[in-house]
């Protein structure tokens, strides 16, 4: 997909009533398993760890491809639904993008899909999800090295 498709999805989700936003976040979280890394493929970056900000392990997988950056993710069972949903949304929409495009995504953009009452409690989750993906992509070797 693309950065434009991410922004379009964010706008669509933002326009929904609170209950529909929550339902969509749960659906996104449930789809994360389909974005798991394929063990038969090479990954330039395997960033798998449990940070203090997170209840369980988050694994982000990145590789450079002629068509852009390929992304995959897997998380432990204790990871919050919101972290799963945001990770799935970014991996799904940013797969194939350039490192520069991925670096341009802001937590503020993704915050728009989180109901305001939930966002007050979970802003750090949004920041964490965006930063982890950008850090993993940032570990790619520059082209030509």
Residues covered by each model-derived region:
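Generic structural signal for hydrophobic core residues of well-folded globular domains
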Residues: 29, 93-94, 133, 137
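Structured beta-strand/loop patches that form or line metal/cofactor-binding pockets in enzymes
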Residues: 40-62
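Alpha-helical support elements that line or immediately flank enzyme active sites
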Residues: 86-100
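C-terminal binding/interaction regions
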Residues: 100, 105, 109-145
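Conserved interaction-surface patches within small, structured recognition/assembly domains
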Residues: 63-80, 94-95
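Short Cys/His-based metal-binding microdomains
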Residues: 81-85
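Extended low-complexity intrinsically disordered regions
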Residues: 1-48
């Amino acid at each position: 997909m693309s950065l434009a498709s991410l922004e379009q999805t964010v706008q669509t989700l933002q326009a929904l009533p609170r209950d529909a936003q929550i339902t969509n976040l749960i659906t996104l979280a449930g789809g994360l398993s389909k974005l798991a890394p394929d063990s038969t493929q090479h990954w330039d970056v395997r960033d798998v760890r449990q940070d203090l900000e997170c209840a369980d392990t988050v694994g982000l997988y990145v590789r450079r491809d002629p068509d852009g950056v390929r992304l995959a993710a897997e998380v432990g069972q204790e990871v919050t639904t919101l972290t799963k949903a945001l990770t799935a949304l970014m991996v799904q929409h940013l797969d194939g993008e350039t490192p520069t495009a991925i670096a341009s995504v802001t937590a503020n953009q993704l915050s728009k899909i989180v109901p305001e009452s939930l966002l007050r409690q979970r802003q750090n989750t949004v920041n964490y999800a965006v930063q982890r993906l950008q850090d993993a992509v940032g570990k790619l070797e520059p082209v030509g090295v």
